[in-house]
Amino acid sequence: MQKNNPRLFGTNGVRGVFGKEFTLDLVVDLSYSLATFFGKGPIIVGYDGRNSSPILSKIVRSVINSAGIDVGNAGLVPTPCLQYAAKRLGYNGGIMITASHNPPEYNGIKPTANDGVEISREDELKVEDIYYSKRFSKSDSFGRDFTDETIIGSYIEKVLSLVNVEKIRQRNFRVAMDIGNGAQSRVAPFLLNKLGCKIITLNGNIDGDFPGRGSEPTPENLKMLSNMVKDSKADFGVAYDGDGDRSLFCDEGGTVHWGDMVGAAIVRYLLKTKHKGAEVVCPINTTMALSLVAKETDSKVIHTKVGSVEVSREMLRRKSFIGLEENGGFMYGKLNEVRDGAMTTALVLEMLSLSDNDDDHNNKEQTLSQIISSLPKIFQYKTKFKCPTKQIANNIVTICLEHGSPKKIETLDGAKIWIDEDTWIMVRPSGTEPFVRMYAESVDGSLLNSKVAEYRRLIESRI
């Protein structure tokens, strides 16, 4: 890449405020760059429910067609469906128009390789080099643009083949589902219907303004889902982000759990049943509970930098079937090594339906809250701070590294500061938004609160 040019790619693709930093000129040139990078087709293009997504899809497809490459139009689909198509339906790559959990004014482009995973960090640099040098491939012929209506049906059938459908149907689960006005409205309700679930939906219509709640599901903005679970006596609730690759779960009592805790429960289930001794790949900001669960089953946890691309690519390198992030992104490699909210929901249903067969569960059906409570007890805290510049964000990381007398420091990504063997604070600049993110864990709730307050004061004094 040419020197002094700013990075286009963040943690997950290229994103920005549409019409501001994410301009039509950028979209056109980036599309030419991707056409040049892929070199041949067909390429599958899909988009989420944001207001600007349909027109951006038309632009991207037209530009790639003009480079002589055939393009399949997936239409409005969750990101995992687009990635599934790129991997399994004969495409040479894929492009998803999405800004995932970002606010409505954002949009973005996420390229996927033909292995179904976002292109690697090295390939991102290759695309950026093409973009800045303007070395675009040209063609005298125009590629074909066609609609692929097989993707969602094929995807759902594949998910069903990976879980015990009969056992799940026998339980007649009631599930409260907050779709968040996002792309999972095209898949999740239909998948759960085939699994025999009674579904109660919230924010089920697609709306790019995300009027029901923010496009990022968090325990703070899922109070309506929590109440719906309790009022409807549902077995659990699930909420998806804007493009449907992440999911947060609410237990039958209305408590919303962070993604890595439910993820740890799924991991324990998989390690004890389908994938004994398997490696688990996750970012460095993931819960300590995961390592403790893996230790129970003589398994191993591999840590990466933060970002689903980092986790997915490491899963491919190590041939691992299990990966996850703390934000509700769970990856099941038997389908694809990417985050997938619908696949995760199916795994939770299977975990609950088969819990009575686990010796550790005393041969009784268990609720989600009982399964979560049986995990190692960890207190968690997560927040983010608005940060005006990347320089200030980087300075905050440095200041935190130099603060106090920690037991150990890890700098794989940002600063992970170990107060003692069972307590840590992590600070890192967001790769998708103008924030500094803070994560903290401890087995001691009082110590956690004290250290969180200490580091909050330190960070807020520098912003």
State the predicted function of each range.
Residues M1-G68, G93, D145-V175:
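An N-terminal, well-structured beta->alpha segment
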